[in-house]
């Protein structure tokens, strides 16, 4: 029954971990990494154990927060009430792109915000629409992120491995960067 709208703003670090202060560049990188990803996995903590579930995403303008529609009577809401630390993982295997973000979730029942983010496609999860008494949002201000973005062509990857073996140098497997807000 979970679901929907998200997006993030972050500061980007380079491969060696130094911080780049260009906020717009960071926004564009996250947009690029998440473009075309329909589902992510939202992970909560349940009695010391990790519990994940798929969530559907839609893109819209963002300011550093992930937003998801959900119902206030779900296990994840109970888990967040006890420990609001979460992780959201995105994956696009065809492009060898992976993104992991973490933050602290907040339950938001602000009707104006719900209406602002609402999309008719959400009726698939919430048949009562905006009149659903359990409808709420999860707001996740992103604190940290890490991504892996490798060349998408298997031939390019294979060439890089062969070149590394031939030259004795480490293969370039693409970018792996940590992002700290």
Which sequence ranges carry the predicted segments?
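C-terminal edge-of-domain segments
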Residues: 2-18, 135-181
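Active-site-proximal "nucleotidyltransferase
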Residues: 14-41
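A short, Trp-centered hydrophobic/proline-enriched beta-strand micro-motif
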Residues: 32-47, 86-90
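A positional/architectural concept
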Residues: 48-57
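Short, charge-patterned binding micro-sites
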Residues: 57-60, 92-94
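Short active-site oxyanion
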Residues: 62-67
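Ligand/cofactor pocket segment of small-molecule handling proteins
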Residues: 70
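Short, structured beta-strand-loop surface elements
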Residues: 79-142
């Amino acid at each position: 029954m979970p679901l929907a709208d998200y997006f993030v703003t972050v500061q980007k670090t380079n491969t060696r971990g130094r911080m780049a202060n260009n906020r717009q560049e960071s926004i564009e990188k996250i947009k690029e990494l998440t473009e075309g990803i329909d589902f992510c996995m939202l992970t909560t903590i349940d009695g010391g154990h990790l519990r994940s579930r798929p969530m559907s995403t839609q893109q819209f303008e963002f300011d550093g927060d992930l937003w998801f529609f959900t119902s206030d009577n779900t296990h994840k809401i109970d888990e967040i009430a006890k420990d609001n630390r979460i992780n959201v993982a995105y994956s696009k295997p065809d492009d060898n792109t992976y993104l992991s973000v973490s933050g602290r979730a907040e339950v938001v029942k602000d009707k104006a915000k719900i209406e602002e983010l609402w999309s008719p496609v959400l009726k698939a999860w919430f048949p009562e629409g905006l009149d659903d008494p359990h409808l709420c949002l999860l707001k996740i201000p992103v604190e940290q992120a890490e991504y892996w973005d490798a060349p998408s062509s298997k031939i390019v990857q294979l060439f890089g491995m062969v070149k590394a073996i031939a030259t004795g140098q480490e293969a370039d497997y693409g970018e792996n960067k940590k992002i700290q807000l």
